[in-house]
Amino acid sequence: MITNVSPKKWLLMSLGAMLLSGCATTSTDPSRQNVGTTGLLICAQNELCPVVTVSWNESNKELLKLKIHLSSTYNKYEIHKVEFTNEKDFQTFAVTGSTEHDHVLGTNRSTNYILAPVNLMSSLKGTNSIKMNIYTDQGIISRYVYKDGVSAPILGEFQKVYQ
């Protein structure tokens, strides 16, 4: 038996145990499953690295919803459009609305999304690179999805959703 424990500590431990047991027994809503998968692009160590969430567009299964998140300590970005290119062809997509801004753990996060065809990546195959250009009010942020045999994690996420 534990002795010399203050009533305050007992209360905190009891509340913690109830919280953990409540989380462990909460069922998952099936409508929330397969919401989307998230991946990164190929980025250098000191570059802003966009996070992209790929999910189905609920109103049209021929389209994917690509949500782009830009997190920066100093800047908020207005995302205007997104372009994918393999240096032979390119596909440009306008964002669907105004950019959302929030502040998470001391970081500014700018978020917007585009709708793209499910076969986007397969339509850009056949070259040594696929690049994603994000057009913002502060310039173009260019990062690779695929380059010289190296795939960004987001390419695998596209393939998971496409299957």
Task: Enumerate the predicted regions with their spans.
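An ectodomain-focused feature that recognizes extracytoplasmic/extracellular
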Residues: 25-78
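C-terminal motif of bacterial Sec signal peptides marking the signal peptidase cleavage site
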Residues: 21-22
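Acidic surface patches and DE-rich sequence motifs
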Residues: 44, 57, 85-86, 136
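Internal interaction segment
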Residues: 90-163
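Extended low-complexity, serine/threonine- and proline-enriched intrinsically disordered segments
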Residues: 72, 76-95, 134
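Bacterial N-terminal signal peptides that target proteins for export
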Residues: 2-11
